Amino acid sequence: MANLTYSERAQKTKSPLVKKLFTIIEEKKTNLCASVDVRSTSQFLDLIEKLGPYICVVKTHIDILDDFSYEKTIVPLLELKKKFNFLIFEDRKFADIGNTVKLQYSAGIYKISSWADISNAHGVPGQGIVAGLKQAAQETTQEPRGLLMLAELSSKGSIATGEYTEKTIDIARSDKEFVVGFIAQRKIEAKDDDEDWVVMTPGVGLDDKGDALGQQYRTVSEVVTGAGSDIIIVGRGLIGAGRDPVAEGLRYRKAGWDAYLARLS
């Protein structure tokens, strides 16, 4: 469905979460997800305040925050979500058996299922990981929740390729109600008419090509126009040292939207 508009896909999908996501993308004219990896809550919230108008999703690693508290971190985060109309994606990368991930998702100090619209998981444990996370979501909230499976990664030497990727896609197909898409480097082809996977792609940069820790960057046009991804995930390109988050937010939003329009044409 790479040649359908986000609006057309919003109308077609059976998933309330995906419908909400594509509607936000269309209304705000942005397919940009901001990855906000900082260690203080004040900086975290300040960056989201600045980037909010330009993004459809904010991606968190909530356990990075040194001063996390539900009241001082999550409550204001949810207020920003309402103010700027974006979804929250906690990049937790669950990777354990069903019962364990159920608790990791819903309990502890973070209570992820209570506030994160989207989370993600590795396929290593098998289908039980999907069942455990879905059960936790159903037991803790009435709000729509969705899971992305990690089909491919952007880091050098990743083993999430070939047969592993295909088996992860098979796991996703075991529950197409809760699993809404993938972290991947390219569009995941639909097997039948009821499939329309959301693909979010990390490792996107307009300036840098990589880092010393194995990250590899591709351009926005390579990812969206060429590979058919739906949402670009950008972190250091927006909030890295010396960067102006507002200027970069505008820049990446325009680049992402232009690449999407080029794909449609």
Swiss-Prot record:
The keyword Cell division does not apply. Pathway: Pyrimidine metabolism; UMP biosynthesis via de novo pathway; UMP from orotate: step 2/2. SMART domains: OMPdecase. It is an enzyme of class 4 (lyase). It comes from the Eukaryota. Pfam families: OMPdecase (PF00215). Substrate binds at residues 37, 59-61, 91-100, 217, 236. One of its GO terms (biological process) is 'de novo' UMP biosynthetic process. Belongs to the OMP decarboxylase family. This is Orotidine 5'-phosphate decarboxylase. The lineage of its organism: Eukaryota, Fungi, Dikarya, Ascomycota, Saccharomycotina. The gene is URA3.
